[in-house]
């Protein structure tokens, strides 16, 4: 079953329907669903297609494999091409007679074994641009390599008609994988497996959240136990530095200086390099407060990939214990309480941010906001700095939001206390929003926005 990605499918079909040659670049981190998106689109399209997954082998082997697919698709004996340029030229020429989709998946593998492949493609694209009906899709997981194809100095510069950087699904699309679970459990599952389709399709609806976590990530030999380290090893040469940074981030250290102090990374410039790489890999994000966006000192770094966060928070540091303990005893001692009282509520804040953005994009707010994020303030009473996690800004001013993932309903005294706390920081809000897992016991008013959990998952 294929879930979500409606926007990306729409863009791909729009490209395929054009009566001219079109070149597309699709990239994103491993396991994010690039190949499945393309295959699903090909299945739904009526246009003839050649899908080839490039291999980490010599050019001759790739030519032989692609030639075999070509022979099968066009129902003639396998053609004997001398090289990849000849093979691709045949397909481009074929597309002068008919619409044809050509997909080169895992393109960086082919690029490694064929010198000057980008230039070869450029020559073919230019040669057939006015006569072919080729829909050429280049796809790959090595983000730096794929982004380099868009650079000004690359031969393909200016020839890509459609670029799709596939990102993790949001909480709503991810929940499509969690059929049969309550809304509360959907938040819990998302807090572990995030928006990566490959992880989410492993969730077993016949088992509890706890059982899924233990079987997939928190037990010796679990299906995803080595997933995080494998991804890092495929992209980063010095894995030790990445592990150090992840451990510091998982403990809650988010400021550059604190990360440097907590980790054993040798220097500031080295830490900058590691963080930049992790950000490009889509596993770490850098956030600036919306009221001080240009102040580098107030930048915060956070693990954005939920599986990586869970792994480094609970598994990585306790892996020796996990390997010799009963899985349920280990879960109860090192995961259960912190997961429910701290981890899930923190991820729930991110879910709420995503929900607000979804509403904003749909035009559901009378005043659409232009900024959303953390708000930095100086607490003069307690002589310390602080942050509010969810604040939006629109033409009328700021709106503050408080997200609570707790068993009890949000009450009137709680709301009044929080509003008083916000006013004490001199944050001038014209509305106050509250988002609750367990509903509300309070009065409504024009300056309040009350959102319950079921609204977040409503169609």
Named regions from a protein language model:
Residues 299-459:
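A cross-kingdom feature that marks ATP-driven nucleic-acid transaction machinery
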Residues 1-333:
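Phosphate-binding site recognition
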């Amino acid at each position: 079953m294929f879930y979500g990605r409606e926007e990306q499918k729409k863009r791909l079909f729009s490209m395929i329907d054009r009566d001219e040659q079109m070149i597309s670049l699709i990239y994103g981190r491993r396991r994010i669903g690039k190949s499945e998106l393309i295959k699903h689109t090909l299945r739904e399209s009526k246009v003839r297609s050649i899908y080839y997954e490039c291999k980490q082998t010599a050019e001759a082997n790739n030519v032989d494999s692609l030639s075999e697919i070509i022979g099968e698709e066009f129902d003639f004996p396998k053609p004997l091409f001398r090289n990849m340029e000849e093979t691709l030229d045949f397909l481009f020429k074929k597309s002068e007679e008919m619409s044809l989709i050509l997909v080169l998946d895992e393109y960086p593998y082919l690029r490694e074994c064929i010198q000057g492949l980008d230039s070869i493609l450029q020559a073919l694209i230019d040669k057939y641009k006015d006569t072919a009906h080729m829909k050429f899709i280049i796809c790959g997981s090595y983000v730096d390599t794929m982004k380099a194809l868009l650079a000004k100095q690359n031969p393909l510069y200016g020839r890509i008609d459609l670029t799709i950087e596939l990102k993790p699904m949001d909480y709503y699309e991810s929940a499509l994988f969690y059929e049969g679970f309550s809304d509360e459990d959907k938040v819990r599952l998302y807090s572990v497996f995030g928006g990566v389709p490959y992880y989410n399709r492993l969730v077993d609806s016949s088992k509890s959240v706890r059982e899924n976590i233990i079987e997939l990530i928190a037990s010796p030999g679990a299906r995803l136990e080595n997933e995080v380290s494998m991804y890092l090893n495929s992209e980063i040469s010095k894995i030790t530095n990445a592990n150090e940074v992840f451990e510091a981030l998982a403990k809650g250290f988010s400021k550059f200086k604190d990360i440097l102090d907590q980790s054993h990374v040798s220097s500031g410039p080295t830490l900058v390099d590691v963080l930049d790489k992790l950000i490009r890999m889509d596993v770490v994000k850098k956030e600036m407060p919306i009221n001080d966006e240009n102040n580098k000192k107030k930048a915060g770094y956070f693990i954005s990939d939920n599986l990586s966060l869970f792994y480094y928070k609970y598994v990585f540091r306790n892996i020796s214990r996990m390997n010799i303990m009963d899985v349920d005893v280990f879960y109860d001692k090192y995961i259960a309480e912190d997961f429910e009282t701290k981890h899930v509520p923190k991820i729930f804040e991110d879910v709420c941010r995503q929900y607000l953005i979804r509403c904003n994009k749909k035009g559901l707010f009378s005043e659409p906001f232009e900024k959303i994020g953390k708000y930095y303030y100086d607490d003069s009473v307690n002589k310390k700095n602080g942050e509010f996690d969810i604040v939006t800004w629109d033409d009328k001013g700021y709106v503050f939001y408080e997200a609570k993932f707790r068993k009890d309903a949000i009450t009137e005294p709680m709301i009044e206390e929080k509003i008083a706390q916000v006013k004490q920081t001199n944050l001038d809000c014209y509305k106050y929003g509250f988002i609750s897992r367990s509903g509300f016991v309070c009065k409504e008013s024009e300056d309040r926005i009350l959102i319950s959990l079921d609204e977040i998952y409503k169609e």
